[in-house]
């Protein structure tokens, strides 16, 4: 401390610059010499200083104040480092896992196969956050969403069995959806044909067993009031004079301009269709209308 004070005094304003530089070099050389003169027998672990035999407690230590300061700082640094050391015996050694640990038995990390194998199956929490600095050399498992590990070729199962079954079922369902062939034209045509014969098949299914002639006559005869077609009015001279009228309960065929239902609530649901409106109807209704017209005109003759 005296040397630093002398240097600060010699550097007062107005002093000689050459004299100041020479004195600074001399003091720096003396400090280096004093540091080299520290006894080799000094041990930092137990902080014991070998004193001379004729040195009593009241006498001064064989070190200057500057040397004592350096020694105390060194002791404090080593003491803090010893207190900050942790027990890493439960942490697997990543270098031993890779086969290049040079520490051997003095390695602070564990070389136990059980600890290393358990660490391999433990998912890395830093990889889940996206900031694992070890990469493929990490001791823990870098698990992908599909269940495989990036740093190993063996799969790891981290999901419950029920979830695995659900995922496998979802994958198989999606695979079958994408790999199923599209409907062919023949299939679509047969589907439309089945829709066209829907009412006739339902009628034949739930009707009692009758002869083909009776079924033909009953099917193509004008509907009665008890059937789904009510208030039927027919004119053989003109087919375009009739149009289908749909209601909430049944399909009604009636002549244009003629109101056949007396119930006001039913009349609100009636919708009159003219000749162009018939073209907008489905092919099934037009086909039924033409067949009914043909049979009623020629079969009874």
Curated annotation (Swiss-Prot):
SUPFAM superfamilies: CCCH zinc finger
Skewed-composition ranges (Polar residues): 7-25
InterPro entries documented for this protein: MKRN-like (IPR045072), Znf-CCCH_4 (IPR041367), Znf_CCCH (IPR000571), Znf_CCCH_sf (IPR036855)
GO MF annotation: an example: zinc ion binding
Key words of the record: Metal-binding, Phosphoprotein, Repeat, Zinc, Zinc-finger
Residues modified to Phosphoserine: 21, 30, 282
Renumbered residue ranges of the record's region Disordered: 1-25
One Pfam family named in its UniProt record: zf-CCCH_4
PANTHER family named in the record: IP09428P-RELATED (PTHR11224:SF10), MAKORIN-RELATED (PTHR11224)
Protein name per Swiss-Prot or TrEMBL: Zinc finger protein LEE1
Organism: Saccharomyces cerevisiae (strain ATCC 204508 / S288c) (Baker's yeast)
């Amino acid at each position: 401390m005296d040397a630093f004070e002398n240097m600060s005094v010699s550097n007062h304003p107005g002093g000689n610059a050459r004299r100041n530089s020479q004195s600074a070099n001399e003091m720096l050389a003396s400090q280096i010499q004093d540091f080299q003169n520290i006894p080799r027998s000094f041990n930092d672990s137990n902080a014991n200083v070998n004193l001379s035999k004729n040195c009593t407690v009241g006498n001064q230590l064989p070190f200057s104040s500057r040397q004592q300061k350096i020694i105390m700082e060194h002791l404090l640094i080593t003491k803090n480092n010893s207190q900050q050391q942790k027990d890493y015996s439960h942490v697997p050694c990543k270098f031993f896992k890779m086969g290049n640990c040079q520490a051997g038995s003095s390695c602070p990390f564990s070389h136990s196969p059980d600890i290393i194998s358990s660490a391999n199956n433990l998912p890395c929490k830093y990889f889940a956050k996206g900031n694992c600095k070890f990469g493929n050399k990490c001791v823990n498992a870098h698990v992908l969403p599909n269940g495989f590990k990036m740093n190993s070729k063996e799969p790891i199962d981290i999901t419950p069995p029920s979830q695995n079954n659900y995922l496998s079922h979802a994958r198989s369902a999606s695979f079958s959806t994408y790999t199923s062939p599209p409907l062919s034209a023949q299939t679509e045509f047969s589907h439309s044909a089945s829709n066209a014969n829907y009412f006739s098949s339902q009628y034949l299914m739930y009707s009692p067993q009758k002869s083909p002639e009776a079924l033909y006559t009953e099917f193509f005869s004008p509907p009665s009031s008890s059937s789904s077609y009510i208030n039927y009015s027919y004119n053989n001279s003109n087919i375009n004079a009739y149009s289908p009228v749909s209601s909430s309960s049944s399909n009604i065929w009636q002549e244009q301009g003629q109101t056949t239902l007396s119930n006001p609530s039913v009349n609100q649901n009636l919708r009159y269709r003219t000749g162009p409106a018939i073209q907008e109807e489905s092919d099934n209704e037009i086909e039924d209308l033409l067949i009914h017209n043909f049979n009623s005109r020629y079969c009874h003759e």
